[in-house]
């Protein structure tokens, strides 16, 4: 009988560290709910002590996610653990994940400590975390470069202190699969109380071996794998969860383990993470790349037509990728749009049907036919922009030519006011952005601009993703239209609204902190 491998997702913690712009609470919650729907066992959603925003994100997700265990990260520091527990206490059950470095290099140069002191600190902090929850995970940072006997001492002590999960990270992606599997086997041989904990692994992809190392560890007895969707993360990224999950499914014959993941949600979750995080998926990416199931060789095409298993070890349908695209027109009613969304696996809570249908009709009038990929793109934008907007694009016009300086006129709704400005720029998009800067006086600096087609043909929707710098913080914006200049304008307005919301959140957090301080003085 096969054993279960626990899937621990760290997209919203380790994965987010790689992003050019921080995610909003709403964006993090949207990803968390998708991960819950996909069936991850544990999701690590933040580092609460790092900022008030991270604390709020962890608390919000812990309050709303019910079918996955929510986890927060904490160093082996009292305040970290206390703040993590405070952010998580709204959940029925939660996990605290605490860590400390164990390699000689980290202990000597980073911690300026000794192995004995590290073990003493680990024991104390695991016990402190156990005061808040029975579910405590302990990580030996840089375990991949820690001598096996030292590692075994730390692991044994952490288990005795009450850690239920012991995580063995290859923090810098240094080890080879046969080497990393040997570390796990070595721990099973050396740690007498190892049967009292689940052994977990957290691998990085610096040498492109994150997934290989994770699978080698599973083969050696690890029963939890940590990683991120699409492999996002610091430097070269984390172990790619969807690759590990599908490798376990496809090669169950040799690994003899399984997960409780709903595989049909992999594709949609991957796409959502890509869009929200503004990190495009390479076409040749395993499992979820656009070319992962493409066959261009004549020999391969002939073989697939005769029997798909000749060249496909898994099907697109097994990850939820429906290759049959159905089209709707402007004559299609609301019920038809809702029915198609239902067939694609969307719940009514994931989009506003009224707003989606209005956007669908406008697009159908322009394109004639609206395909599944159009609907999914509209639903994504619909979800991103469903919050009240302080700024709204009312009108824009651009004059530009090969020998002319681009000039843009923009009208922007700012709260209850309508403001208008005109500006010149280096092309139509820059002219619009200069006009918007004049209206808002925000002085936003564009850091990154990318355009992607959502669909095929000259009338495909164009999605513009931008990253902008404002007052030392980076904000992400997205816009969607058949006109890329309009998409660009909408993306900048999305940035404006994200800046405004961030300021409102900061005001609210300051108000709460002040009230808390006032209450202390009263007592």
From Swiss-Prot:
Keyword tRNA processing among UniProt keywords: no
Localization annotation: Cytoplasm
Enzyme Commission code: 2.3.3.13
PROSITE patterns documented for this protein: AIPM_HOMOCIT_SYNTH_1, AIPM_HOMOCIT_SYNTH_2, PYR_CT
UniProt keyword annotations, A-Z: Amino-acid biosynthesis, Branched-chain amino acid biosynthesis, Cytoplasm, Leucine biosynthesis, Manganese, Metal-binding, Transferase
Ranges of residues in domain Pyruvate carboxyltransferase: 5-267
Residues annotated for Mn(2+) binding in this entry: 14, 202, 204, 238
Region (Regulatory domain): 392-523
Cofactor(s) needed: Mn(2+)
Coiled coil: none
Reaction(s) the record says it catalyses: 3-methyl-2-oxobutanoate + acetyl-CoA + H2O = (2S)-2-isopropylmalate + CoA + H(+)
Annotated metabolic or biological route of this protein: Amino-acid biosynthesis; L-leucine biosynthesis; L-leucine from 3-methyl-2-oxobutanoate: step 1/4
Cellular component GO terms held in the UniProt record: cytosol
Single GO MF descriptor: manganese ion binding
GO annotation (BP), single: L-leucine biosynthetic process
Enzyme class, spelled out: transferase
Family: Belongs to the alpha-IPM synthase/homocitrate synthase family. LeuA type 1 subfamily.
Quaternary structure, from the entry: Homodimer.
Stored NCBIfam families: leuA_bact, PRK00915.1-1, PRK00915.1-3
Role played: Catalyzes the condensation of the acetyl group of acetyl-CoA with 3-methyl-2-oxobutanoate (2-ketoisovalerate) to form 3-carboxy-3-hydroxy-4-methylpentanoate (2-isopropylmalate).
PANTHER family in the record: 2-ISOPROPYLMALATE SYNTHASE 1, CHLOROPLASTIC-RELATED (PTHR10277:SF9), HOMOCITRATE SYNTHASE-RELATED (PTHR10277)
Protein name: 2-isopropylmalate synthase
